[in-house]
Amino acid sequence: MMHLTRCIALLALSLGATLATAGETATVLITGANRGIGLEYARQFEAKGYTVIGTARNPGEAQELAALGVRIEALDVTDGASVAALAKRLEGVPIDVLINNAGIGDRGDVDVLATDLALFERTLAVNTIGPLRVTQALLPNLRAGSRKHIVNMSSRLGSITLNNGNYPAYRASKSALNQVNRSLSIDLGKEGFVVVVVHPGWVRTEMGGAEAPLQPDESVRGLVALIEKLEAGNNGRFYDYLGAELPW
């Protein structure tokens, strides 16, 4: 029954994306595109005819991404020089959709009192500061784009309302990202930007693990459908991969 409900919701999302939007030539930049959800984003957007720019810390090791024939750029979201260099290489290139996907996980079997503070800092650096750093650097490209969409990959675990313990660093990093997203939506909304945070579901990736119920293609299919129909009324909101709004 749960699977049927997901299928119906995904179909509704897909039908909601207009043919004009789906058929436009647009450029999407995806951070952390060498594996998992990021790679699946690249695969599905490329199949739809988008110009795809995928980033990876080590492009030479991103064989699956390279096989798609998309543009690959080196990027470490925690390194200001790396982000600035990417912005320099992309100078003058309009970007319609930025997907801040690069992220790291956290051990789920520890409580906040036992968490490794060095790991906590690293998780915040990647999952919270990284997306803001990339957004700041690529803002000229996004302003030159026609859609002006920024999608920050959050998680249901970032919801304060839904917190039931464990994953302290990851939860905190995604809650903080939600706040960053809200601030961006306010500051950039007046320019016509739509800035959202999304939860991909529990996905069977290296981070999600083998027990996760969702395959990457199912999760990303829903997310792509959601992204393609974003409009002003969605700005600043928090959605799951089926398009349902989540509590903060």
What spans do the regions from the language model cover?
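Catalytic loop of short-chain dehydrogenase/reductase
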Residues: 104, 111-124, 143-190
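Conserved Rossmann-fold cofactor-binding substructure of NAD(P)-dependent oxidoreductases
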Residues: 78-93
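Rossmann-fold cofactor-recognition segment
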Residues: 67-81
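Conserved glycine-rich cofactor-binding loop
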Residues: 34
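Conserved active-site helix of classical SDR/Rossmann-fold NAD(P)-dependent CH-OH oxidoreductases
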Residues: 39, 43, 132, 174-182, ...
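C-terminal helical subdomain
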Residues: 190, 197-200, 209-248
